[in-house]
């Protein structure tokens, strides 16, 4: 058996999320359907670097699957894209050692979150969070700096989070303004359920002047979801890049 690693992108608008769900359209479901056709009806399980929720997008999700087929690496994207719907694309594929795992071998993940602060744009409604308020980018970057490092992120994850260990390391956290768009960028060794969206929702409150940047430190210390801000909507979030050891 060969293990194939693929980098994929998808528009999450019309998906119930990445992970397979009964009676619902999912990214994993579309990938496994396409692979089943290529394997002449044989089921092939797909493993991903992590799950994304309904309406969340991916620019650089990573998956792997095992196959007995001898299709060359460079032909896998073309073969799969011919069978996948228009809102999922395989960008590249390569054979990897059997020790590689799309989820368990991850070293870093980068998420980006897009916020539109200008007038409502009907063509961007599925891809940015419309937030038409004056915000201070320097204040938000000051707030984000408190998140860099290793912390218990209990305050910044959903109460539905199933994992016990809520300690994560954030390596980079920043927001930049490009015209009428704010782009949040967070790089870490892993992220809890809704963590990026809660961080964005809270930091936007700092940007609006409703909180001071130093409150982020207090929120972390309290380890209480109710003291952080609202969860920003899913459609502004992108899984941008997943890093592994070479």
Swiss-Prot record:
SUPFAM superfamilies: Pseudouridine synthase. Substrate binds at residue 111. Keywords: Isomerase, tRNA processing. GO terms for molecular function: RNA binding; tRNA pseudouridine(38-40) synthase activity. The active site is at 53 (nucleophile). The keyword Ubl conjugation does not apply. It catalyses: uridine(38/39/40) in tRNA = pseudouridine(38/39/40) in tRNA. The keyword Nucleus does not apply. It is an enzyme of class 5 (isomerase). Pfam families: PseudoU_synth_1. Its EC number is 5.4.99.12. One of its GO terms (biological process) is tRNA pseudouridine synthesis. PANTHER family: PSEUDOURIDYLATE SYNTHASE, TRNA PSEUDOURIDINE SYNTHASE-LIKE 1. NCBIfam families: hisT_truA. Formation of pseudouridine at positions 38, 39 and 40 in the anticodon stem and loop of transfer RNAs. Homodimer. Belongs to the tRNA pseudouridine synthase TruA family. This is tRNA pseudouridine synthase A. It comes from Anoxybacillus flavithermus (strain DSM 21510 / WK1). The gene is truA.
């Amino acid at each position: 058996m060969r293990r194939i690693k693929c980098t994929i992108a998808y528009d999450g608008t019309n998906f119930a999320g990445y992970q397979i769900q009964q009676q619902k359209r999912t990214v994993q479901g579309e990938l496994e359907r396409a692979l089943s056709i290529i394997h002449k009806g044989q089921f092939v399980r797909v493993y991903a670097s992590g799950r994304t929720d309904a309406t969340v997008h991916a620019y650089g999700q990573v998956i792997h699957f095992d196959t007995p087929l001898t299709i060359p690496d460079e032909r896998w994207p073309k073969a799969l894209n011919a069978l996948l719907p228009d809102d999922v694309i395989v960008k590249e594929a390569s054979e990897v050692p059997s020790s590689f795992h799309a989820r368990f071998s991850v070293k870093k993940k980068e998420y980006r979150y897009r916020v539109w602060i200008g007038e409502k744009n009907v063509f961007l409604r599925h891809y940015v969070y419309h937030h038409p308020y004056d915000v201070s980018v320097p204040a938000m970057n000051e707030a984000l700096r408190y998140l860099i490092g290793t912390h218990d992120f209990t305050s910044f994850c959903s109460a539905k989070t199933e994992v016990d260990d809520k300690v994560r390391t954030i390596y980079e956290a920043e927001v930049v303004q490009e015209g009428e768009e704010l782009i949040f960028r967070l790089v870490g060794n892993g992220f809890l359920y809704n963590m990026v969206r809660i961080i964005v929702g809270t930091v936007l409150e700092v940007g609006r002047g409703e909180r001071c940047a130093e409150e982020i430190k207090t929120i972390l210390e309290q380890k209480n979801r109710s003291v952080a801000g609202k969860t920003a909507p899913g459609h502004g979030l992108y899984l941008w890049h997943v890093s592994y050891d070479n």
